Amino acid sequence: MLFRSEDLARRIAEKLDVPSADVFDVSKLTEALVNEYDVLVLGSSTWGAGELQDDWYDGVKVLKKCDLSHKSVALFGCGDSDSYSDTFCDAIGILYEDLKDTHCKFCGATDTAGYTFDSSIAVVDGKFVGLPLDEVNEDSKTDERISAWAEQVKQEIS
């Protein structure tokens, strides 16, 4: 799944008109790097029983040390809505929970319509907290979902 997240990050960056030089692996995240940007687009695959990818545990610590109160944060994740229907894209829900007290402005909430899953902690107030993507079962929907989400995020941060 790690390579799927990286591929999705690059595809999303392209739709957001973000140069590839501004796409970073979370393992390289530093306070100085975070402070360079007003908008953060954060993505993670969901591992095991609805867990973050391991590098994110340190990444969250870095983010919590930063002043995010004037930053916009958009989340995306990849998951498997068939095999892990009860923890679909939980990783972005974990990131949301970990960062909601930083006073950042979350953007890019996505309607649950069109998704088939049983449960996800990434659903808050009836919407996903970011963009969930399923490259295992619904890869034919990914490009359209990314395009629509990127336009939404652009509008929300302008």
Regions found by a protein language model. Give the residues of each.
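A short beta-strand-loop structural module common to alpha/beta enzyme folds
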Residues: 19-30
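FMN-binding flavodoxin-like domain, especially the glycine-rich phosphate-binding loop
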Residues: 7, 11, 15, 19, ...
